[in-house]
Each structure stands twice: as C-alpha cells, then as structure tokens.
C-alpha cells in the first residue's frame, strides 16, 4: 500500500516515522537497508558508482542498487580483490547472466534473481520494507500473535495495488473460489494489516514490479506460509529452507494447501535461520 492511500493524519504519522527512522534499520529482520549495512561499501546512486570506479580497490563485499548493477560491467577491475556483490533495494529483475559484472566479482547475491545457480550466484531475500519508509517495515507489527491451529485455512488475498497482471489474475480466481480464498479490501493501517495477516495460515504473494515481494517475507515473519506462482526465482529459494507453496496457477491453491496441511506445521519464524540478519553476516563473512 502506498502512502497516498492513507488519511491525512495517517500520512502525518508516516512522515514523523520517516524522520525518526531516517538512516535506521530493522535488525535483526531482513531488509534492503539492513543487508547494505553489513557490506564494506554501498552504491546507492550514480555518484557512488563513479566514486567506486575511480577510487575503490579494497572493498570485499559491495552492495549495489540492483538497477545500477549492469553499469558495473563498464569498470576496469584490474588487480581488484576477490569481491562479493550484494544487489538489492530495487524492483529490478535479474533475468540474464549478462546483467552482472563477472570480471569484477567472484560471487553474487541478487534480489529478484532468475539466474541463480547455487554455485556463485544466489538469490537474496528482499525482506521487509525499509524502516525509513515508515509504513510496513515496523518490527512491532511483525510479531506472531496467533498460533498455527487457530488460524483460518483460507488464503488471504490483498489488499495490494495493481502493479502486475498476476495480481489481477489472482483476484479473478479468488472472486470465483470463495471457499479457498478470502479477499481483504483496503486501505488498512499497518497495525490492522498485521493483525489481519496473523489470522491466516496462507498468504497469496503475487509478484508486483519485481518478482519478490515484501509480503512474502512479512508472511514468514508472522508465522504464515506464502503462496507464489512457481518460477526460477521461487525454486532458487530452496537453499534457504523456508516454508512456502509454489503453484502453477492460482486455481491450484486449494489442492496445494491440502497437500501442505497433511505435513507437520511449519517451523516458527524464530527457527528459520535465513530470516535473520546474523545468518547473512555469517554466510557472507562480514
């Protein structure tokens, strides 16, 4: 939900949060800014990129805004150290290996990745919304408040903005399959949205501008199971050992849920190591 969907008092509160949380992160929860904070160097804009090209030869772990990553291929990396590239904080999808600078880096952790190979290219979570935005990334709203067995078995759908046709397709199916899906209409305050999500075992997470969504990770932090359309991106998350459901289309959700519920309940968020920033610090050697 964008800030424009809220009332004037709510927008004022969001602005106050933005001032309060400027340059803050939601550690130990994952977010783009949180992952950037554990890197040696951060490239957030064109001037950062130019400074990196001119002067930096020592940073081992580099965070770059995803849509700027293709420009790194233009840099001469002669005598540079063995580097790891962390790419995020953008809706940019990585769909071809030619988009990343193989000459300057030996390993890559990419958000919105369709090209991960689990060898030197890995998919990185986008995590929750950055705390500095002041809306949906507030740690107090990411708690588990209902146990698994007390939740609805329907799939929560929405509210969300129409940023991709997949969302329209989901709504069309959900309107017909009312025994499987529950459409939630907005706008909702961040607190009310969190309370609503805690009432469901399963959360539909259709893609938006990028393949990954904050809703996917919000669902996991609140003890729910995200449902996504199967893709190279969703398949590449398997190394993170997370509970999720992949379907070929949204009409399959009902049968997929039945198969999932025949298994043991999912692990609680506290036991999912890859949801937390310390896991990534250790993995990356920060």
Residue ranges and their predicted role:
Residues 4-214, 221, 225, 229-239, ...:
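Nucleotide-sugar donor-binding catalytic core of glycosyltransferases
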Residues 190, 250-253:
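Residues at or immediately preceding the N-termini of alpha-helices
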Residues 215, 243-244:
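Solvent-exposed, flexible loop/coil residues
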Residues 244-250:
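Conserved acidic donor-binding segment of nucleotide-sugar-dependent glycosyltransferases
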Residues 252-274:
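Conserved donor-nucleotide binding/catalytic region of nucleotide-linked donor-dependent transferases
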Residues 261-262, 284-286:
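Short, hydrophobic alpha-helical segments
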């Amino acid at each position: 939900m964008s800030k424009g969907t809220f009332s004037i008092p709510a927008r004022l509160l969001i602005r106050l949060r933005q001032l309060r949380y400027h340059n803050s992160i939601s550690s130990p929860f994952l977010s783009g800014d949180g992952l950037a904070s554990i890197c040696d160097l951060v490239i957030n804009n064109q001037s950062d990129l130019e400074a990196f090209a001119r002067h930096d030869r020592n940073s081992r772990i580099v965070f770059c805004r995803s849509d700027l990553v293709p420009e790194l291929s233009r840099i001469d990396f002669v005598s540079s150290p063995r580097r790891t590239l962390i790419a995020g904080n953008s809706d940019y999808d990585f769909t071809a290996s030619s988009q990343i600078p193989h000459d300057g880096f030996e390993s890559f952790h990419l958000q919105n990745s369709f090209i991960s190979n689990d060898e030197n290219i890995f998919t990185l979570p986008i995590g929750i919304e950055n705390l500095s935005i002041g809306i949906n990334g507030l740690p107090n709203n990411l708690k588990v408040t209902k146990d698994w067995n007390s939740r609805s078995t329907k799939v929560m759908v929405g509210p969300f903005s129409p940023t991709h046709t997949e969302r329209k397709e989901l709504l069309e199916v959900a309107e017909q399959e009312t025994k499987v899906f529950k459409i939630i209409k907005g706008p909702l305050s961040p607190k009310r949205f969190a309370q609503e999500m805690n009432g469901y075992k399963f959360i539909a997470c259709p893609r938006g501008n990028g393949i990954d969504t904050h809703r996917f990770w919000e669902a996991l932090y609140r003890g729910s199971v995200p449902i996504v359309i199967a893709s190279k991106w969703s398949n590449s998350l398997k190394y993170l050992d997370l509970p999720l459901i992949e379907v070929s289309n949204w009409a399959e959700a009902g049968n997929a849920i039945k198969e999932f519920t025949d298994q043991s309940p999912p692990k609680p968020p506290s036991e999912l190591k890859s949801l937390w920033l310390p896991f990534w610090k250790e993995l990356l050697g920060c």
